[in-house]
C-alpha cells in the first residue's frame, strides 16, 4: 500500500490546487483553492478558455462579481470530480471588514446555489483575523460553513473554536519557514523534523486542545514543505496537500501509522483557554511569528487578487 492510501485510512485527504485536471489521479475527498492557486491555474493554456468564457459572460459586471464568478466556475469544475467539499476564498482585502466579508461570502454561496450546488459542499475561506473570525461566526449561524485560513497561532485556533467555525487551516510550512529563517545558520533540520517541526507542533497542540475540550471545529493541516510534516500529522482530521506532495506519497511505500490520537487527547491535562477581543489581540501581538505571517499572507493573497484583476482586464 502506498502512503497516500495509508493516510486515507485515518485522515481525510484534501487536494490543495486550482488545477482541477490533476484531481482524478489522487481521488481526494475535498479540495481547497486560494487566490494564488487560481491565479496560477488561469495562467496555464488549458484554463485560458475558462477565463475568457467567464469574462465574456460577465460584460458590464463589476470586477468583484467577475472574480467571484470565476472562483465559482473553478469550484463547480472541482465539485464535478470530487465527492466532498471545495473551499472558495473571500477577497483577502476584506480581511479586516466583518460586514463586507459576510456580504461577499453570501454572494459566493448564492452563485453556487444558482449552479445547483448544495451549500454543504462549499466552505468559505476567510483569513483568521479577529474580524474574519467574527464574520465566520455570523455565517455559521446562517448555515454557511467556513474555513478559517492563514492560521498560525494557538490564539487564532482558540477564537475559531469559540466561534464554532466549521474548519481551520493551520499553516504548517509557513510556520516552519519562519523558524528556519530566524535560526539562520543555527537551524538543525534533523532536530526540527517530524514531531519536532515547529509547524507540526503547532497543529498538534491545536488538535489536542480541540479534542480534549470537545470542540467540533475540524482541524486541517495545510501548507506543507515535505513529506515528514505530513506523516507527522497522520491522524489529523484533514490534511490539504499540493499535487506534487500527493504524487510523492503515491510513490512511497514506507509504513505509516497515526501520529495524532483523539482519544489520547481527551485524557491529557490541558488548561481551558478563552479570549475576549482585547486578550486575543494581545496574545496574537505577543506571537511575533503569527503576527508577521498573518500580515504577510494577507498581503500576498491581496497582491494576487490584483494580478488576477489585471489578467481579467487584459483578456476582456
UniProtKB/Swiss-Prot annotation:
Homodimer. The keyword Cytoplasm applies. Transaldolase is important for the balance of metabolites in the pentose-phosphate pathway. Its main location: cytoplasm. GO terms for cellular component: cytoplasm. It comes from the Bacteria. InterPro entries: Aldolase_TIM (IPR013785), TAL/FSA (IPR001585), Transaldolase_1 (IPR004730), Transaldolase_AS (IPR018225). Keywords: Cytoplasm, Pentose shunt, Schiff base, Transferase. This is Transaldolase. It is found in: Cytoplasm.
Amino acid at each position: 500500500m502506498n502512503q497516500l492510501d495509508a493516510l486515507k485510512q485515518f485522515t481525510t485527504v484534501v487536494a490543495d490546487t486550482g488545477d482541477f485536471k490533476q484531481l482524478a489521479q489522487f481521488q481526494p475527498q475535498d479540495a481547497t483553492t486560494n487566490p494564488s492557486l487560481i491565479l496560477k491555474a488561469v495562467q496555464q493554456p488549458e484554463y485560458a478558455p475558462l477565463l475568457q468564457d467567464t469574462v465574456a459572460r460577465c460584460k458590464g459586471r463589476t470586477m468583484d462579481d467577475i472574480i467571484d464568478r470565476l472562483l465559482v466556475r473553478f469550484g463547480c469544475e472541482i465539485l464535478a470530480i470530487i465527492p466532498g467539499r471545495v473551499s472558495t476564498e473571500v477577497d483577502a482585502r476584506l480581511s479586516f471588514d466583518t460586514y463586507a466579508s459576510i456580504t461577499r461570502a453570501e454572494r459566493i454561496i448564492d452563485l453556487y446555489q444558482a449552479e445547483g450546488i448544495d451549500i454543504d459542499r462549499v466552505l468559505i475561506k476567510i483569513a483568521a483575523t479577529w474580524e474574519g473570525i467574527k464574520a465566520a461566526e455570523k455565517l455559521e449561524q446562517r448555515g454557511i460553513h467556513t474555513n478559517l485560513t492563514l492560521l498560525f497561532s494557538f490564539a487564532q485556533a482558540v477564537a475559531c473554536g469559540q466561534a464554532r467555525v466549521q474548519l481551520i487551516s493551520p499553516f504548517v510550512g509557513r510556520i516552519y519557514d519562519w523558524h528556519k529563517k530566524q535560526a539562520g545558520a543555527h537551524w538543525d533540520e534533523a532536530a526540527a523534523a517530524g514531531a519536532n517541526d515547529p509547524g507540526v507542533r503547532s497543529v498538534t497542540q491545536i488538535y489536542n486542545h480541540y479534542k480534549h475540550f470537545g470542540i467540533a471545529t475540524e482541524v486541517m493541516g495545510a501548507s506543507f514543505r515535505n513529506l515528514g510534516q505530513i506523516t507527522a500529522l497522520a491522524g489529523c482530521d484533514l490534511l490539504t496537500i499540493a499535487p506534487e506532495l500527493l504524487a510523492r506519497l503515491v510513490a512511497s511505500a514506507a509504513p505509516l501509522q497515526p501520529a495524532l490520537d483523539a482519544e489520547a487527547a481527551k485524557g491529557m491535562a490541558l488548561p481551558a483557554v478563552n479570549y475576549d477581543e482585547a486578550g486575543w489581540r494581545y496574545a496574537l501581538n505577543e506571537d511575533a511569528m503569527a503576527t508577521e505571517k498573518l500580515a504577510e499572507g494577507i498581503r500576498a493573497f491581496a497582491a494576487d487578487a490584483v494580478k488576477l484583476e489585471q489578467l481579467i482586464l487584459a483578456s476582456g
